[in-house]
């Protein structure tokens, strides 16, 4: 959906991980080779799959595929399954890619939908993609620019609008469950819950999402 929407207004070079990369943050690959596989190559759209992390994808796009060529006007990543509010920004592969784009001094945006279902309906996000992209491209929002866009999992008519806000200071209370595999070997499974340390603050991303923004 992100490609289909952006393609309406721009030429696209897409370099995306070939597998899900949740929780990869700003990880890069140092101990194995990276490969690119061409998926689509047609006028206005080139798509490649990479066996690396989201940040690897941005790096290889800038430092290999566009070396000596015109730099892009914008870097966009997503659409992420689930929230990238609060401390989740630091763990997010989606936002890792967007932040990496900012390191190249290119305006960058990461999109997320608060729905973890594999068959999540991203239609709600779609209506905000182009308006936010146009704003990032045409208004002086400062440089480097990296926007973290989170959309609540609500019907479109229930979303109250776009609210610029700061990052919540909450964090995860982590619990490692000790389990055993079929051969009797112990292993650990990360669980836990998010603790909002400033629930009364009305200027944070957590508040905005819980209140339909």
Feature map (PLM): residue ranges:
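A cross-family phosphate/adenosyl-ligand binding-site feature
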Residues: 4-64, 71
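Short beta-strand segments
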Residues: 15-17, 51, 77-80, 111-112, ...
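Alpha-helix C-terminal capping segments
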Residues: 61-68, 96-107
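Short, structured loop/turn "capping" segments at alpha-beta junctions
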Residues: 69-72, 108-110, 139-146
């Amino acid at each position: 959906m992100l490609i289909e929407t952006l393609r309406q207004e721009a030429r696209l070079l897409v370099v995306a991980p070939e597998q899900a990369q949740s929780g990869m943050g700003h990880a890069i690959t140092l101990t194995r080779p990276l490969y690119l596989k061409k998926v689509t190559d047609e006028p206005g759209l080139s798509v490649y799959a990479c066996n690396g992390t989201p940040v690897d994808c941005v790096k290889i796009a800038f430092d290999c595929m566009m070396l000596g060529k015109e730099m892009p006007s914008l870097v966009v990543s997503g659409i992420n399954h689930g929230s990238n509010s609060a401390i989740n920004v630091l763990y997010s592969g989606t936002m890792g890619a967007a932040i990496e784009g900012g390191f190249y001094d290119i305006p960058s945006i990461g999109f997320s939908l608060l729905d973890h279902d594999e068959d999540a309906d991203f239609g709600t996000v779609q209506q905000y993609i182009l308006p936010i992209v146009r704003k990032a491209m045409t208004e002086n929002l400062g440089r480097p620019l990296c926007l973290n866009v989170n959309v609540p999992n609500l019907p479109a008519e229930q979303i109250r609008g776009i609210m610029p806000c700061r990052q919540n200071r909450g964090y995860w209370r982590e619990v490692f469950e000790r389990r055993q595999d079929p051969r009797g070997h112990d292993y650990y499974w990360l669980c836990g819950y998010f603790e909002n340390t400033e629930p009364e603050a009305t200027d944070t991303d957590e508040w905005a999402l819980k209140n339909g923004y």
